[in-house]
């Protein structure tokens, strides 16, 4: 089914927007499958997932219908042939016309809380994404606390203050 998605679609809920270069390629299906494997965990966190490339929605449908790997995907695949969304998120490679490999965590206010851009040949790990979302949600729900490196749900956080300066 085809749906219309706008920047308003990212408001009122946590969202992940995952740009990838192109359908029918090599690294992209491995990433999108990995994201699908974590989709239930993301939904439990109240997160909606959107993937996007500069392909058309017809190309997405063809890929979805012809690939066993991509056929498993149940989250939205955005077609951005006008390159507007890719350009707005500053992931458009103006030379190739393709989106860079970019991931954005967007809070319910529509504010980007985390952004990651990978080189074309480097795939992403969705389990790391799940942990970043948990950290972003924790910080939002616990003002005055921050999550240190390698933080996992249940770990101690930090409360920045003058007393903490130079003691970490």
Swiss-Prot record:
Enzyme class: oxidoreductase
One Pfam family it belongs to: AhpC-TSA
A cellular component annotation (GO) from this entry: cytosol
Chief place of localization: cytoplasm
Active site: 28 (cysteine sulfenic acid (-soh) intermediate)
Keyword presence, Mitochondrion: no
Catalytic activity, as annotated: a hydroperoxide + NADH + H(+) = an alcohol + NAD(+) + H2O
Compartments (UniProt record): Cytoplasm
Enzyme Commission (EC) number: 1.11.1.26
Alphabetical list of CDD domains matching this protein: PRX_Typ2cys
UniProt record, GO biological process: cell redox homeostasis; cellular response to stress; hydrogen peroxide catabolic process; response to oxidative stress
Record-level Gene Ontology MF annotations: NADH-dependent peroxiredoxin activity; thioredoxin peroxidase activity
Role this protein plays: Thiol-specific peroxidase that catalyzes the reduction of hydrogen peroxide and organic hydroperoxides to water and alcohols, respectively. Plays a role in cell protection against oxidative stress by detoxifying peroxides.
Family listed: Belongs to the peroxiredoxin family. AhpC/Prx1 subfamily.
Protein name per the record: Alkyl hydroperoxide reductase C
Organism placement in taxonomy: Bacteria, Bacillati, Bacillota, Bacilli, Bacillales
